[in-house]
Amino acid sequence: MAEFHRIIIDTDTAGDDAAALIIAAKNPNIEILGVTVLAGNVSLEQGAKNALAVLELIDDPTPVYMGASTTFSGEEKTCFSVFGADGMGEADLIHPRSKPQEKNAVDFILETVRANPGEIEIVALGPATNLALAIQRDRETMLKVKRIWAMGSAGFGPGNATPVAEFNVYKDAPAYKMMIELGVPLTILGLDMNNEFTWLYAEELQEMRSGNKIQQFMANCTRKLLEFKQRNGIPAVDFPDALAMACLAWPDFVEETTLCSASCITEPGETYGMLIFYKAGHTYDSMPTIVGKPNISVVSKVKSSEFVKRMNAVFLS
């Protein structure tokens, strides 16, 4: 029998976040208690509108809460999205009728975990600012999170924000450092799991434009991403956030994880935002004393060839 998950989704809602939301909302073994939003791919306000629009698309009443508009240190975030200015393909898709809740995202996270100790899992699809603010305010409560699932880091491969740093970590490395050092069980999916077998190609997207309302939405919200990828010689779009959600939603999807401890580079310079993983049981010539006990399961093998088929099945359900 599949494990039941009670989750909070923390997101900077763009196209691949939309796919992740849909995968979670349509899974009978997942209860989404709330969607918390922060600035990242797009501004906080735009991210909230995007989340509301996606939930309305699938008739899901999950409440949306607005969180951090700046970095953990209070600096304004320069938002950039390969999904277009609105994070959703600039296809005039985002006209939500509902509004976010008045309660702040950090308050919601802490109240929910406090009321359900050891039961709540958090799926972090964007920068970790909301989680860092929650940790700063009430670390003892955040230690009662059952598990954090995160799309972040380059895994054991190259980055996308820089050669060594992935976007979510790079946008607020001090916040990510706080998250990985909290000490609760943490599963991280990095960019190295995002390969050509997990992409949707231009021909498939064109077919989806004649499909149901979810398929049409997903094909259109990834329009700008496809243009960006094609300019770089790739005739397809990728879904790293949806891959991260798949690790939670589909129990057999993850074939291998590597237990690690980690450090996050927060000092300015070429390696800023790099997440360095130290494999448990592996002997290194020089092991930094700042690295704690292994508590991070880094996803190192998934059923890549199954991903698109399963995601499309969700869109059709």
Which residue stretches match the model-derived regions?
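Active-site histidine-anchored catalytic micro-motif
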Residues: A2-A53, D92-N195
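Metal-dependent C-N hydrolase catalytic cores
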Residues: H5-I7, A48-A115, K293-K303, N312, ...
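A residue-level signal for conserved active-site and pocket-lining positions in enzyme catalytic cores
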Residues: V64, M179, M245
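Short, surface-exposed amphipathic charged segments that create phosphate/polyanion-binding patches used
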Residues: K77-G84, T162-E166, L205
